[in-house]
From Swiss-Prot:
Lineage: Bacteria, Bacillati, Bacillota, Clostridia, Eubacteriales
GO BP field: lysine biosynthetic process via diaminopimelate
Keyword Flavoprotein annotated: no
Annotated Pfam families: DAP_epimerase
Entry binding sites for substrate: 11, 64, 74-75, 162, 195, 213-214, 223-224
Keywords attached to this entry: Amino-acid biosynthesis, Cytoplasm, Isomerase, Lysine biosynthesis
Pathway assigned to this chain's UniProt record: Amino-acid biosynthesis; L-lysine biosynthesis via DAP pathway; DL-2,6-diaminopimelate from LL-2,6-diaminopimelate: step 1/1
Species name: Desulforamulus reducens (strain ATCC BAA-1160 / DSM 100696 / MI-1)
Protein family: Belongs to the diaminopimelate epimerase family.
Coiled-coil positions: none
Protein name: Diaminopimelate epimerase
Length: 284
């Protein structure tokens, strides 16, 4: 199996161009667990598979390191756009990518023939409780109390095609992400589980965040999470519609435009390529 290792701000993926998918494994969950293992596999936060699409330029499938499938990933889609453009597979400034969250359109920002950054139209956020989804009465979830193991957090829920639970705090240093993150991820209020973001507001156009990703745990960056944080900042009156989001792996520029759509701009990096031997023949 030929692969390319890529990352967006340290959120890393194993990218495989599966084409028609003919002859490729149906057991992507087991494959992802194997190749994403950082001690016995290649090591990554997730496996990204590219297939031919009948409705877009390409179809992207994302499988987390725990084998669960994700609807969408902002860092992964920037990496996909860079890979397709730099390798001459799709030489267009705008690439239509089919995902479980709908068709997403990354825009190439190039310099001297290669991709410098990628601006992605992430679509419109969903803020109604049922769209997250989150258990409870109809309406938006903005600064709502959520009890977690005897402690109460004020949460804001946003969907970017995948669920996000955002919590604003005075200081990120006071948060034990590895303890609280997994507790909220599987909280019964979220029937499909949730990504969890803790956010410190630095100013009306600047925030810091850390993320516990559903199915992956703590990661260096989360593109959809940064978009959800930008929306939550506006809904709570903490930030303006253009905000720089600082993550452990670097920064993303997020704009919630007046047309209601979210635009994310950030880098993508190709690390290396190789061939991986999948030892179980049923997974080849």
């Amino acid at each position: 199996m030929y692969f390319t290792k890529v990352h967006g701000l340290g959120n890393d993926f194993i990218l495989v161009n599966a084409g028609t998918g003919q002859g490729f494994t149906d057991d992507c969950s087991t494959l992802a667990k194997e190749v994403c293992d950082r001690k016995f596999g290649i090591g990554a936060d997730g496996l990204v598979l590219l297939y031919d699409s009948g409705v877009a330029d390409v179809r992207m499938k994302i499988v987390n390191s725990d084998g669960s499938e994700a609807e969408m990933c902002g860092n992964a889609i920037r990496c996909v756009a860079k890979y397709l453009y730099d390798h001459g597979i799709i030489k267009k400034d705008e690439i239509k990518v089919e995902t479980l969250a709908g068709i997403i359109v990354p825009q190439i920002i190039q310099q001297e023939g290669s991709v410098k950054a990628v601006r992605v139209d992430m679509g419109e956020p969903r803020v109604e409780r049922a769209e997250i989804p989150m258990i409870g009465p109809p309406g938006q979830v903005i600064g709502e109390e959520l009890a977690v193991n005897g402690k109460v957090y004020l949460v804001t829920a946003v969907s970017m095609g995948n669920p996000h639970c955002i919590i604003f705090v005075p200081d990120l240093e006071d948060i034990s992400l590895t303890q609280v993150g997994p507790q909220i991820e599987v909280h019964p209020a979220f029937p499909k589980k949730t990504n969890v973001e803790f956010v410190q507001v630095l100013g009306p156009n600047e925030v810091r965040m850390v993320v516990w990703e559903r199915g992956a745990g703590p990661t260096m960056a989360c593109g959809t999470g940064a978009c959800a944080v930008a929306v939550a900042g506006v809904l709570n009156g903490f930030t303006e519609r253009m905000v720089t989001v600082h993550l452990p792996g670097g920064s993303l520029m997020i704009e919630w435009a007046e047309n209601g759509r979210i635009y994310m701009t950030g880098p993508a990096t190709e690390v290396f390529s190789g061939e991986y031997t999948v030892y179980n023949p049923s997974r080849r």
